[in-house]
Curated annotation (Swiss-Prot):
This is Anthranilate phosphoribosyltransferase. It is an enzyme of class 2 (transferase). The keyword Nucleotide-binding does not apply. Anthranilate 1 binds at G79, N109. Homodimer. It comes from Saccharolobus islandicus (strain M.16.27). Its cofactor is Mg(2+). It comes from the Archaea. Belongs to the anthranilate phosphoribosyltransferase family. One of its GO terms (biological process) is L-tryptophan biosynthetic process. HAMAP family: TrpD (MF_00211). 5-phospho-alpha-D-ribose 1-diphosphate binds at residues 79, 82-83, 87, 89-92, 106-114, 118.
Length: 345
């Protein structure tokens, strides 16, 4: 593969085929392409607009080069991040609830643009985010939950870290996280930072051997199920791609004030989650339940979203014990107790 020819093709706004994109991504991730060319390629892709084939090719390369573990029937709640609203880390809270009934392989990283990525909030709760593969399998067996820290499970990505940091713009790698779970999770609730990317990412997901993925983008521009209004969804399954629009009131609840969901730090996010689990923060609890409801539908545990919401009400009642179990087997209970004390007021 001639990298300069690939670059010329991208500059001319021609899309790469899947195989071309996969080969290119492998060369970049392995550190075989000079940084100046890597930056040129990433910018050219962004300016052209990443195609479905390019996303699929890059995702396949990242999956192949990842440290892998096997977690049958797992669900992930990883989204793209990057909506910039700074809301409580609801995907992590939902993952904890889901682990009461199904294996969860939560793929994630530190915050991109928000105040609290999955890794940040789990650390604040006392969780040890560096989990080697054998230990990960053991934790799933014992607790139904494991966090797969992206930087640990995709070690070759260090070869592009400097370029990405120097560029300081969104690149194709920012949207690959939820498509590259190291446990090859077959089910997913995937928040998407932009409504415009729903179609592109759903078509990409369809090519990547998922059983069922629900991609969501909610009003007012949030990469979660909307707490205030409409959520735009793409439901991807073996049968194809279905487009759905759903309003928060369709759960049978009122809209949730967005300002009640904003956090200032990872610790703040952890406290809000624990308060919701304890029944002390109704707004955050509702936000967790509506997102969990859609994830339950992705797992085919319920027949519709409203039934999922009713199921989530039951799950959140058992969430504190589950969180204690998860941290006690892989973390620092002292940290969790500190958060519990701060949450009890």
């Amino acid at each position: 593969m001639n990298i300069n020819d690939i670059l010329k093709k991208l500059i001319n706004k021609s899309d790469l085929e899947i195989d071309e994109a996969e080969e290119l991504a492998k060369a970049i991730i392995r550190g075989e392409v000079p940084e100046i060319l890597v930056s040129a390629i990433l910018v050219a892709l962004r300016m052209k607009g990443e195609s479905k084939n390019e996303i699929v090719g890059f995702a396949r390369a990242m999956r192949e080069l990842a440290i892998k573990i096997d977690v049958p029937n797992a669900i992930d709640t990883a989204g793209t991040g990057g909506d910039g609203l700074g809301t409580v880390n609801v995907s992590t809270a939902s993952a904890i609830l889901l682990s009461l009934i199904n294996p969860v392989a939560k793929h994630g990283n530190r915050a991109v643009s928000g105040k609290s990525g999955s890794a940040d909030v789990l650390e604040a709760l006392g969780y040890n985010i560096i989990v080697p593969p054998e230990r990960a399998k053991e934790l799933v067996h014992k607790t139904n939950f494991v966090f797969l820290f992206s930087q640990y499970y995709h070690p070759a990505m260090k070869n592009v870290a400097n370029v990405r940091k120097t560029l300081g713009i969104r690149t194709i790698f920012n949207i690959l996280g939820p498509l590259t779970n190291p446990a090859n999770a077959k089910y997913q609730l995937m928040g998407v930072f932009s409504k415009d990317h729903l179609d592109l990412l759903s078509k990409s997901a369809y090519e990547l051997d998922f059983n069922k993925v629900i991609l969501v983008h909610g009003e007012p521009g949030i990469d979660e199920v909307s707490p205030i209004g409409k959520t735009f969804m793409k439901i991807v399954s073996k049968r194809g791609i279905e487009e759905v629009k759903f309003d928060v009131t369709d759960f049978g609840i009122s809209s949730i004030p967005i300002d009640k969901l904003i956090v200032n730090s990872a610790e703040d996010s952890a406290i809000k989650i624990v308060r919701a689990f304890l029944g002390k923060d109704e707004h955050v609890a509702e936000f967790i339940k509506i997102n969990t409801a859609v994830a339950l539908f992705a797992l085919d545990k319920v027949s519709d979203f409203k039934e999922g919401y009713e199921y989530a009400k039951y799950l959140i009642e058992n969430s504190v014990n589950k969180l204690n179990e998860i941290i006690s087997l892989n973390g620092d209970l002292t940290k969790l107790k500190t958060i519990m004390v701060k949450s009890s007021g």
